[in-house]
Amino acid sequence: MLTTLLPLLPLLLPGWALCSQEASDGPWDLHMTQVSYFRNPSQVWHRGNATLGGVLTHVLEGPGRNVSIQQLQPLQEPDSWALTKIYLNRYLEEFVGLVQVVHQERGVTFPLIIRCFLGCELPPEGSEARVFFEVAVNGSSFVNFQPKTASWVAEPHAPSRVVTYTVDQLNKYNRTRYELREFLQDTCVQYIQKHITTNNLKGSQTGRSYTSLVLGVLVGCFIVTGVAVGIFLCTGGRRRC
């Protein structure tokens, strides 16, 4: 169930993480972030949003099982959006359950904040697109993805056996390396080229819808989180993974 629902996570980003909520003349971009604050194993507050070309498209905020989820752009029909919200809430329940299991197994120290920030930016014609996936734990940079080598690396200031173990695990699987790079460099960039540059964000869209893209192509991306979140949580504990 967790793997099935992970693709929905990119719809969630913290409001304070936005640089702008209006379209600009700068690089086109698709930015996604997810933040979960755990006061203790049973109390969590989720915040999130997504922006496309600087336009806020989705927001989420709330505690535990009482999360408010809103679609700010008419990207899904009411029936479809209602189903998406069900999946999102179900995912959040699974996410909290996972943290509780890891706490039981590893003795995690609370409070705990996990933040993932990823996306792609399309600069003026002729320049290479910028893609990124960054993970922070308790406000400190933890690991990031290097698309040129399709590999994860530890942040320079965070050397530890836990971080080393995490990087080793993430670099073991094609899904967390090459499939992620394909999403960031190809699917994400192509989506921006196809939809934002043709001014399709608020109008009718050709090809696959925004929702189909988000729920489909981010599977590989957020399976990364599924594989790694338990490892990330260990950084808040006193035991070695």
From Swiss-Prot:
Its GO CC terms are: extracellular space; membrane
Task: Enumerate the subcellular locations listed in this protein's record, separating them with semicolons.
Answer: Membrane
SUPFAM superfamilies assigned to the protein according to its UniProt record, in alphabetical order:
MHC antigen-recognition domain (SSF54452)
**What InterPro entries does its record include?**
Endothetial_C_recpt (IPR015669), MHC_I-like_Ag-recog (IPR011161), MHC_I-like_Ag-recog_sf (IPR037055), MHC_I/II-like_Ag-recog (IPR011162)
Keywords, A to Z?
Blood coagulation, Disulfide bond, Glycoprotein, Hemostasis, Membrane, Receptor, Signal, Transmembrane, Transmembrane helix
| Chief localization | membrane
Side of membrane Extracellular, spans: 18-212
Q: Where is the signal peptide?
A: 1-17
Has the keyword Transmembrane been applied to this entry? Answer: yes
A Gene Ontology biological process annotation?
A: blood coagulation
Tissue note: Expressed in endothelial cells.
Q: GO molecular-function annotation terms?
A: signaling receptor activity
Can the keyword Phosphoprotein be found in this entry's annotation? no
Cytoplasmic compartment ranges equal: 234-241
The glycosylation sites are N49, N66, N138, N174
Question: What is the membrane topology listed in the Swiss-Prot or TrEMBL record?
Answer: Single-pass type I membrane protein
* Biological role: Binds activated protein C. Enhances protein C activation by the thrombin-thrombomodulin complex; plays a role in the protein C pathway controlling blood coagulation.
Q: What protein does this entry describe?
A: Endothelial protein C receptor
- Gene that produces this protein: PROCR
